[in-house]
Amino acid sequence: MNDFIIQDGVLVECEEPTGDVVIPEGVTAIGSNAFWGARNMHSVYIPDGVKKIGESAFGACSGLKSIRIPHTVTSIGTDAFVCCGFETIELPPKLSSIGEGVFRLSNLREISIPDKVKTIGYKSFKGCLHLEEVKLPQGLKLIKDDAFRDCHKLKNINISSDVEIGWSAFGMCNGLADEDGFIIINRIVFESPAMHRTAIVEIPDGVEIVDHATPSGDSELVYYEKGKEPVTGFCRKVILPSSVKTIRPTAFPWGNLVEIVSRSNANITVGLSFPWGTKLKKITLPKGAELPPNPFSYNAEYAKTFAGIKIVFESI
């Protein structure tokens, strides 16, 4: 028997929920943390009339295998289903956005996003290691930062060319990598398996936005060069094609990179890219390229760090 605490239509808490849980009629909202950590709860039936599911409402319910969400739900809060055990879920048609971290670290394998959804939130599916297929609506406008980061098995996703995609949104979604190991979506290159295979990373021609050009980890990698013995080391050099128009601050996240060669006139502004210091010594740009005033002066500390970088202009 599950004992519910309900206040003004909001289900605030369920004491020691186990097995199959049926939420009472008359409830209009599931409160924040209402079922947090209920690992012995296997299924949940939410009745019609519920309009809102609060923040972390079902967070860390690792034993939860199925949940019924009624068509009346229009709002799902941050981290509502973080670390949940279900593999599929049917979302209500009136839902207009997928909030921050809603499904991150969950056991989802596939999901279809309702037609009214315009935005997929920050870290909404991050770390869903078993997620393979996502069906996006045609009217989707924005996929925010880290939305699908580290969904290693994701291999099927339909993205319109006019969708705005945030920083690191598909980083290390290895199932989306091309035959050369690069993850390129709408001409944006994200952190890819190819960047973990060699000390010299050459971004493919046709890429217009560089989200990542080097691995995000700070540890040494094992490189497997063709015809050579495995080598342990860091990514040391990045080559950017002439097609590049934008280089995001996330492009060079760690300090072991020594050289950047750009065939593009796009501005290389470091911004927050090297927050722990850098070994960068040289940047080579094509003749005629222009740098913005004080390109490395994000703050006084950065300006001092980058004072020794050699910038060379030459025919590339």
Task: Label each region the model flagged.
Residues M1-N2, A34-G37, T214-S216, F252-P253, ...:
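Surface-exposed repetitive/solenoidal architectures
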Residues M1-Q7, E15-A29, R39-K52, S62-S75, ...:
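Structural signature of tandem-repeat unit edges
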Residues L11:
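Active-site-proximal loop->helix
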Residues S32-A34, G54-G59, G77-A80, G99-V102, ...:
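Consensus positions within tandem repeat domains that build extended binding/scaffold surfaces
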Residues P249, P293-N294:
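Alpha-helical elements of the RecA-like P-loop NTPase motor core of helicases
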Residues S273-W276, F296-N299:
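A structural signal for leucine-rich repeat
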